Regions:
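Pyridoxal 5′-phosphate
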Residues: 1-349
């Protein structure tokens, strides 16, 4: 939420769409500018300016990793959450398909002409995933015949853990390449029980990817402690320019690159590395984490005050998501008889 001053410099309209994107932090602009104007060399170059850029890239990677409870070698810098999700879904699913000896298009059994049921790869996602995940899974289905299993959620957008257990029982787990789920839902703000999801997936020998795009900078993320296999983040959600993100990937996790080229980022994301972008990600996330720690209670109180105020003036308004286990700065409502589009147009300036 941001206060937009009017022409006289006095407080004006409120920007209430920070869940979609935030403004770029002044600290981020200040930190990244030297790497756009002065220390702009390619970090792969062996000359001194290149070495200076490489040191800055390494420092940014270490700082960014620490802010997510990860190690520097877990971090693959990308162009944002969509690319991170695509790399995770397509890269892990394809690598696991080969590792499990599954075939992208099942043949027919010679005896009866029926398609063998035990050769088709599977991927499990939740029913409410972001299009970057859902469409990547659909791509696997369209081009390689993957079975896409969608786990339902309850009225508060919590994943059905029993349904996940059932989908991983028995022979099915041997064909399941991966599980992918959100950490926090961008539409309703519900936070999923990630440690329990990891426990269930790993109990069946299946890696799990977590889309943390909406959560990073809003709640603590402990990548290594949670034992997650891969995790996506996007910088524009925590004060960096758009087009910056990262995928955290454990070294144990089978994954294949989506982009081919010079072999940067552990060979998983080729392309000249964006030093200024990496610096921006590190500064933006650390700044957001510090603000979260200092203002968490205040933010929750403001959120709850807004929820109470809306309910007073619109008693029929329905708060979506979990009323307790939700992002600290997220409030989402359904107003019976009013479409979301009509409400937004009416509130827009």
């Amino acid at each position: 939420m941001a206060d937009t001053p009017n022409a006289s410099g006095e407080p004006g309209e409120l920007y209430l769409d920070a869940a979609a994107t935030e403004s770029v932090s002044p600290a981020v602009i200040e930190a990244m500018t030297p790497f756009l104007t002065e220390a702009y060399a390619n970090p792969a170059s062996v000359h001194q300016p290149g070495k200076t850029a490489a040191r800055a890239l390494d420092a940014a990677r270490a700082s960014f990793a620490a802010a997510l409870g990860a190690r520097p070698d877990d971090v693959i810098f990308t162009s944002g959450g969509t690319e991170s999700d695509n790399l995770a879904i397509k890269g892990i699913a394809m690598a696991r398909m080969r590792k499990l000896g599954l075939r992208p298009v099942c043949g027919f059994a010679e005896a009866d002409g029926k398609q063998p049921a035990n050769c088709r790869p599977r991927i499990i996602i939740s029913a409410i995933e972001h299009p970057a995940v859902a469409q990547s899974a659909a791509w696997l289905h369209e081009w390689f015949g993957f079975e896409v299993v969608r786990i339902p959620v309850d009225a508060q957008a919590h994943l059905d853990l029993d349904a996940l257990e059932r989908e991983l029982d028995g022979e099915a787990s041997e064909r399941t390449t991966m599980v992918s789920t959100m950490l926090a839902n961008n539409e309703v703000g519900t936070v999923e029980p990630v440690e329990e999801l990891v426990r269930i997936a790993h109990a069946h020998g299946v890696p799990i990817h977590v889309d943390a795009v909406q959560a990073a900078g809003q709640i603590p993320i402990r990548f290594r402690d949670w034992d997650v296999d891969a995790l996506s983040v996007s910088g524009h959600k925590f004060g960096t320019p758009k087009g910056l993100g990262a995928l955290l990937v454990r070294g144990r996790t089978p994954i294949e690159p989506v982009l081919s080229g010079g072999g940067q980022e552990r060979g998983l994301r080729s392309g000249t590395q964006n030093v200024a972008g990496a610096v921006a990600l590190a500064i933006g996330l650390n700044e957001s984490n510090a603000r979260m720690q200092a203002q968490y209670r205040e933010l929750v109180a403001s959120r709850d005050m807004l929820i109470d105020a809306v309910r007073r003036v619109a008693p029929r308004a329905d708060l979506t998501g979990d009323p307790e286990r939700r992002l600290p700065g997220h409030a989402s409502f359904i107003f019976p008889g009013v479409t979301g589009e009509a409400l937004l147009v009416d509130l827009d300036w």
